[in-house]
């Protein structure tokens, strides 16, 4: 994502975007990251062989199977499923559960790979008390941003961040804000890329992305 790379580079970091898609013509390396994570977990050759503990991975992991709205889909009570038969709903449950299982295994294997290789990893995902990783993951998030519009984003939606092999800094650097009208978020393909707001990203990075041993 060009905005993310630009903001990282403005702080002196070299940044590359890896993604399975290139829908905005901004991806540096188009690759199936899920397959690469699986290969790295199985200790096979993968892109993780070229990533060291001096690098940092920022993972904007697909969230649509983890967030609380998915419960309505599992129960068949969301508007789009109200006219479905019980059989259709149950078949859909099987599909959702397979996708949830894939997402959960992949994000967990990503964390394990980074722990093994001592690679700093920061994972971003929506926050709620019913978020699947909040309830069923061994590693708790370390930062919860309850109102992203305060950092110039379009969305207020609470967001959480996991820090693995690194620690967050909590210092605040105040800059003038660029206020944006709030927008609603709809469901997307489970593996699709997010669109980023550069103002929020810059403020989140400037707030202090991580420290190692007390130093950045």
Regions found by a protein language model. Name each.
Residues 1-215:
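Conserved active-site and SAM-binding loop architecture
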């Amino acid at each position: 994502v060009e905005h993310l790379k630009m903001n990282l580079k403005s702080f002196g970091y070299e940044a590359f975007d890896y993604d399975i898609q290139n829908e905005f013509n901004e991806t540096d390396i188009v690759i199936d990251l899920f397959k690469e994570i699986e290969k790295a977990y199985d200790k096979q050759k993968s892109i993780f062989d070229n990533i060291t503990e001096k690098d940092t991975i920022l993972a904007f992991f697909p969230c649509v199977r983890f967030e609380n709205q998915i419960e309505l889909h599992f129960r068949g009570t969301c508007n789009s499923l109200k006219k479905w038969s019980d059989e259709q709903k149950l078949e859909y449950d099987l599909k959702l559960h397979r996708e949830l299982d894939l997402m959960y295994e992949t994000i967990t294997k990503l964390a394990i790979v980074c722990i093994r290789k001592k690679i700093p990893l920061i994972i971003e995902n929506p926050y709620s008390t019913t978020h699947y990783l909040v309830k069923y993951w061994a590693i708790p998030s370390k930062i919860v941003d309850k109102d992203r519009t305060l950092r110039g984003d379009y969305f207020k939606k609470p967001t959480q961040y996991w820090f693995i092999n690194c620690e967050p800094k909590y210092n605040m650097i105040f800059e003038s804000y660029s206020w944006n009208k709030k927008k609603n978020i709809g469901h997307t393909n489970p593996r699709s890329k997010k669109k980023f707001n550069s103002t929020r990203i810059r403020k989140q990075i400037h707030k202090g992305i991580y420290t190692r041993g007390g130093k950045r």
